[in-house]
Amino acid sequence: MRIEMKNISKAFNGNPVLKNAQFMIETGEVHALMGENGAGKSTLMKILTGVYKKDGGTITIDGQEHTFKNAKEAEEYGIAFIHQELNILSNLTVAENMFLGKELMYGKTGILRTRQMNAIAQQQLAELGLHVKGAMLAGELSVGQQQIIEIAKALMTNASVIIMDEPTAALTDREIETLFTVINKLRKEGVSFVYISHRMEEIFSICDTITILRDGEYVGKRSIPETSFDEVVSMMVGRSIGERYPERNSQVGDVIFEIRNGTKKGKFENVSFQVRKGEILGVAGLMGACRTDIMKAIFGYEPLDSGQIFINGQEVKIDSPIDAIRQRIAFITEDRKSEGLVLDFSIRENLALPNLESLSKGSVLSDELEQQFTADMMKLLNVKASSGEQAVKSLSGGNQQKVVIAKWLGIHPQLLILDEPTRGVDVGAKKEIYSIMNKLTEQGDAVIMVSSELPEVLGMSDRVLVIHEGKVGGILEKDEASQESIMALATGGE
């Protein structure tokens, strides 16, 4: 299937989101669609699949002009959209998910052909390298396995083009390898993939071509063998952003935070490490190693069962997030949408939440202080929005992440814990987040950064703490740290 979109335009409430955008994909091609958050990538694909109606432009499929009324119509024609939030119902079986809306029945009796559906589902998944029973509950599978189910569902509707939005955001390295194996197998069979992602290494590994959008406009198309990371970034942001990771200029000082023999039954045990003033401590490990659980314990979300925590040499008890905030510890969670933000609230309201005391006069929240704080934070972090009254759910992923960071900067943290700080964030916003981390450490504060992206860990960390199955696998100095040395410790080696 060959798809060509020309001069596509779209506006919401008079605000242009797409302006003469273009996109073309060939049969059997893996085509990356890139751009900063808010560039219009998802909107363009939603227009292709009938979720949104275009204001102008043409869509041709195999030479014939087409416009789909809804996503179901596009799916029936052979174009499937697998969203970042997977459409899997965890309380249904694998087969029930795959046949949802197209169940096999005995005539018109309403009785399901359960055994047959289980067998077909099992066979379809086996062909994609996933060997699970059709009768198994989908909620018992990993995110990577659920993603393969989504691809199998698309193939059952004879999909010729599969659109994937941030497909590897929550996958382990092994699951990413499995996904790429499936993509490579299917492209040889003529299936095309639109691959929306910010992960450069993956795009240069799996894709054939890149189309770049900027501010809703088509910037250009490049063949992977004929382009470079720097060229793609420059096309995305309209300028060269210089070095990928900003230079570290902070002076590492005394120990600001220490945990000794921290234990949470069933999750991690005897975890001990220190963080110094002016330091970024990177935390690496495989998915399931309990890195996030350790950070949640430090912040008092799920307090330690045993062990000690010291701040500036003094032992402290942290049994709740309030205790942590009093010690000027801030925690930016990996799941910004469900744990970091109140999506229906405005930017101003979200920024105020952990800062109510400092934004109040007496016991009354000061509108003047709140407005000034919002303006200051939006300027400091370059939050792109119409005003502080804009709902955070309408912001791009990068700007949402900046709001999460901004609200915690209000407590003037001496220790900032960042869990997957740049997940789903474009390359320009990543650089801004890295600069914020550097500014904090340059003024003597400390940062703990949990990340599954090893280039990020290596590029930003002064030392690297590696967690393996809930225990400290090792701590590497900057000159000792490499992808190989980190992975060796993460897998239980030395």
UniProtKB/Swiss-Prot annotation:
Its EC number is 7.5.2.7. SUPFAM superfamilies: P-loop containing nucleoside triphosphate hydrolases. InterPro entries: AAA+_ATPase, ABC_carbohydrate_import_ATPase, ABC_transporter-like_ATP-bd, ABC_transporter-like_CS, P-loop_NTPase. ATP binds at residues 35-42. CDD domains: ABC_Carb_Monos_I, ABC_Carb_Monos_II. It is found in: Cell membrane. It is a peripheral membrane protein. One of its GO terms (molecular function) is ATP hydrolysis activity. The keyword Lipid metabolism does not apply. Keywords: ATP-binding, Cell membrane, Membrane, Nucleotide-binding, Repeat, Sugar transport, Translocase, Transport. Residues 3-240, 250-494 form the ABC transporter domain. GO terms for cellular component: plasma membrane. It catalyses: D-ribose(out) + ATP + H2O = D-ribose(in) + ADP + phosphate + H(+). Disulfide bonds: none annotated. Belongs to the ABC transporter superfamily. Ribose importer (TC 3.A.1.2.1) family. The complex is composed of an ATP-binding protein (RbsA), two transmembrane proteins (RbsC) and a solute-binding protein (RbsB). Part of the ABC transporter complex RbsABC involved in ribose import. Responsible for energy coupling to the transport system. PANTHER family: CARBOHYDRATE TRANSPORT ATP-BINDING PROTEIN MG119-RELATED, D-ALLOSE IMPORT ATP-BINDING PROTEIN ALSA-RELATED. This is Ribose import ATP-binding protein RbsA. It comes from Bacillus cereus (strain ATCC 10987 / NRS 248). The lineage of its organism: Bacteria, Bacillati, Bacillota, Bacilli, Bacillales. The gene is rbsA.
